[in-house]
C-alpha cells in the first residue's frame, strides 16, 4: 500500500529529497526537476504531493497525506492537528523582527507586517507590547520601506535579503528547522511503515550530527 507524503516546493523539498536518498530511498534522478504536483515512486510504494509550504500541514491533518515535511515556522503559524515526530535538522533559519536602521520604539499605534500573523501576535503579546499585525503574503521587506509598518516578522536565513533592502535585524524570535509530521490516524493504522521511515531518517540525521563534532 502506497504511503503519501506531502512536501513543500522549493529549498526544503530539495534538502528533504537528499535526506530520503541518504536514508536509502531510491528516488529517480529527475525527481527534483519534475514539474508535476503529484509524483509516484512505485518501487518504494511512495507518492509525493508537492504543495505550498503553508499548506503541507493541512494536507496531513485531513489525511490526504499520511506524512509530510514542514518548517517549524509553518507549524507554529498553522497549529494543525498533526504529530510532529522528528526534527529533520534541514533548512535551518530563524524567525526575527526587523526594521529600517532609523526605527525607534515608542511610535503611536505600532504596526508589524508578517506572513506569520499568529506567531507575530503571540510574540509581541509575550513581550507585553500591543501592536497591530498586518498580514502580507510575500515581499515583507517592502512594508517598512513604504511606511506600511514600522517592523516586520519574517524568516531570516543568511540575512542577505534584509541587507539588500536596507533593513536590520532587531531581535531573534526562535530558531527554525523542518519537521517530519504525521497524520494521527495514519500513525495508528500504518505505524510499522511510518516508524520504519522515521528510524531510517533519524539514523541519517544522527550520523550527520556526529560528523559535525
Swiss-Prot record:
InterPro entries listed in its UniProt record: ATP_PRibTrfase_cat, ATP_PRibTrfase_CS, ATP_PRibTrfase_HisG, ATP_PRibTrfase_HisG_short
PROSITE patterns, per the entry: ATP_P_PHORIBOSYLTR (PS01316)
GO MF assignments: ATP binding; ATP phosphoribosyltransferase activity
Any single Gene Ontology cellular-component annotation: cytoplasm
Subcellular localization: Cytoplasm
Record has Amino-acid biosynthesis as a keyword: yes
UniProt keyword Zinc, yes or no: no
HAMAP family named in the record: HisG_Short (MF_01018)
Protein name: ATP phosphoribosyltransferase
Organism: Shouchella clausii (strain KSM-K16)
Gene: hisG
